[in-house]
Amino acid sequence: MISGNITAKAEGKTFALSEGGYLYCPPGSLMTFVNAQAEDSQIFLYKRRYVPVEGYAPWLVSGNASELERIHYEGMDDVILLDFLPKELGFDMNMHILSFAPGASHGYIETHVQEHGAYILSGQGVYNLDNNWIPVKKEITSLWALVLYRLVMA
């Protein structure tokens, strides 16, 4: 949830989701949701075809980013990682929030083949894409989405 409040249902369970809330539904699960307030709610919805690993399966996961363990990304004090999904072979992906303090960055330029992207939750910064520095900021920039970034304005 980016803002607002919704009521979501999946696998016979009901979830009240507010800012920072999330719900992962495994393959074959039906999810429904309705706005639970008079004002608009803003959600980030991501759907992709599941790639199974024999002998493993994902399960329904729900929570709130405010309750997740804050991990110092690659040992850096100025970059915090919040992982939404378990690090289990049944999950063929992850969603997470990276929070960058002013002046912080990855320790290297990312080069990998995984599907990757960003939705800017707050702040502004620059993103190196194919050796081009692209200005990014909240609500204006959306690189093909799989990773959520929180950039703190200086």
Labelled PLM ranges:
Residues 14, 83, 96-112, 146:
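Conserved short histidine dyad/triad with adjacent acidic residue
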Residues 14, 22-24, 45, 95-99, ...:
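Conserved hydrophobic/aromatic beta-strand scaffold that supports enzyme active sites
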